[in-house]
């Protein structure tokens, strides 16, 4: 009789252990959903918002853009470029091509309050800065593709007498129905200057910033 009791208890324990092992991967899968790229993310009614930061100077070796620039001549040159360099059109054309090629139905959003969203990569650490309720009042969509762009200058780490031009494109997908972040990624391009700081013209500066933007676009092209 004892052997029979031990056998029944053993079978029950083994059955429960198997059931627990079967359930664990399912929970893990639900908590670790990741996507290879933005096109893998399931979306419904989609709005696309392009948020371009003014050209500035990056805090060295970071992606933080500062509009307070030590050099007045460089500051004035960047202001001139800002007034005539239409980054929005370049990013918009690229975004529309990718979305059209992949048969998305979407709405481009031209007017918005920049205070409603962070101007960088959105992560679980800063998603609380997204003002979802205000966004939903302004945007009648289920999902929002937010494309943040930062372009500017930094010092060449190998030669402080030269600059580098950098452009970062942050692709964020927000779930407006559930106040959640679905996906985010960064693409960044860098161009090294051939000329020393004191020999830079506005045209050369614009050329290098545009090349850093093109390099970033090329990275996106290769992925999408």
Map each language-model feature to its residues.
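Active-site-proximal beta-strand/loop segments in catalytic clefts of secreted hydrolases
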Residues: 49-52, 148-150
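Sec/Tat-exported extracytoplasmic proteins
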Residues: 50, 91-103, 216, 220, ...
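A charged, solvent-exposed segment within the mature domains of Sec-exported extracytoplasmic proteins
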Residues: 124-192
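Short glycine-/acidic-enriched loop or helix-start segments at secondary-structure transitions
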Residues: 12, 58, 156-158
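C-terminal/domain-edge helix-coil "capping" segments
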Residues: 18-47, 54-58, 161-224
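N-terminal segment of the mature soluble domain
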Residues: 55-146, 180, 184
């Amino acid at each position: 009789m004892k052997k029979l009791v031990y056998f029944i208890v053993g079978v029950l324990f083994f059955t429960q252990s198997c059931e627990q092992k079967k359930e664990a991967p399912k929970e893990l899968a639900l908590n670790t959903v990741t996507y290879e790229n933005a096109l893998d993310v399931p979306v419904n009614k989609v709005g696309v918002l392009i948020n371009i930061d003014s050209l500035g100077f990056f805090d060295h070796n970071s992606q933080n853009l500062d509009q307070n620039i030590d050099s007045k001549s460089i500051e004035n040159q960047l202001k001139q470029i800002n007034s005539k360099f239409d980054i929005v059109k370049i990013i918009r054309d690229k975004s529309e091509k990718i979305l059209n090629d992949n048969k998305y139905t979407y709405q481009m959003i031209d007017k918005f309050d920049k205070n409603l969203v962070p101007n960088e990569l959105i992560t679980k650490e800063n998603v609380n800065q997204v003002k979802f309720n205000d966004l939903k009042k302004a945007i009648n969509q289920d999902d929002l593709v937010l494309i943040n762009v930062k372009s500017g200058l930094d010092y060449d780490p190998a030669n402080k007498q030269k600059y580098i031009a950098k452009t970062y494109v942050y692709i964020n997908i927000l779930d407006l129905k559930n106040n959640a972040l679905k996906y985010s990624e960064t693409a960044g391009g860098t161009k090294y200057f051939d000329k020393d700081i004191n020999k830079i013209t506005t045209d050369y500066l614009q050329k290098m910033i545009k090349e850093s933007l093109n390099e970033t676009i090329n990275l996106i092209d290769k992925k999408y």
